[in-house]
Amino acid sequence: MPESTKSESTMSETYRHFTRLFPYPHERIAVGAPATDAMARYDELAQLVHTERFVPFFLNLTDTVRESMVIPVSLEHDIIDDGETLTPEQVSAYTRAILQRYRTARDAASAEEYGSAAIAQQLRRVMDDGEEANEDDPDDFNLNKLMGEFMSSDFLPDEEPEDDAPCLCALLRYELVDEEDKGEMLLLQIPTDDPADIPAYLPFGGWNDCPDAETQLAFTHYWREKYGAIPAALDGADCLEFLVERPVTDPVEAKNLAVEQFAFCSDLPFQVFEDFEQLTEFIHQSRQWYFWWD
């Protein structure tokens, strides 16, 4: 079951540093706690979003996570990326700056209009990177050809709907571990009434092929508007999960969504799933999405 407090002796240095910089109200989930219990508590808190002005979010906190969140804030303020140097006020200033840049760039466009353009731009970047890799290694697969064949194929996902209530993979894994060094699961209360803003409050990404916070905001606002999809859990520094209120039900639209998710996480159809077809099967009518970056 969730624990709201622990004794000082059980507080890790990672936890102390994180909560000093990100002083969001939270509950601590005991290692081995049933995932269904944690999900039930999440659902309870989610009912309070509009009255209490916060959104729940699971974070499996590790030192790598803490460091990955310190770096973008440090870069924003042009200071050494030292968790001891930063202040909570600088973290708040970072959040405000990221949100303001997103809103300024979006201007009068709707979340869906701006998101569509941003996703197209991100997809071009990913495809260009794949094309360059193919030029360096002609024996490697041709990404542009692969994408074209997928979109023009007759493949459509199965029509069978998903009946089971969603349960986040991060919680299922945490239920099975029995070592404290696997991280500590926190159920945070992020101080916003818009879950699409979470990337600005918990900065991660901007490394390898993981988009930075500003790019993530374009995706999260677009997907929230279109599917009611919201970020729900960050498992370590490289696994992000969404819960989806209005799953995609049209098979052709599911293929298009698979391409959008590829733009967001280019490792998805090749390292998490076997191919675009398997990714499409997973997201079609699914109430949860999963992303992992190498």
Cite the ranges covered by each PLM segment.
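N-terminal start-of-chain detector that recognizes signal peptides
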Residues: I29-A30, D158-E160, P203-G205, P211-L217, ...
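Surface-exposed, low-hydrophobicity interaction/linker segments
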Residues: V177-R224
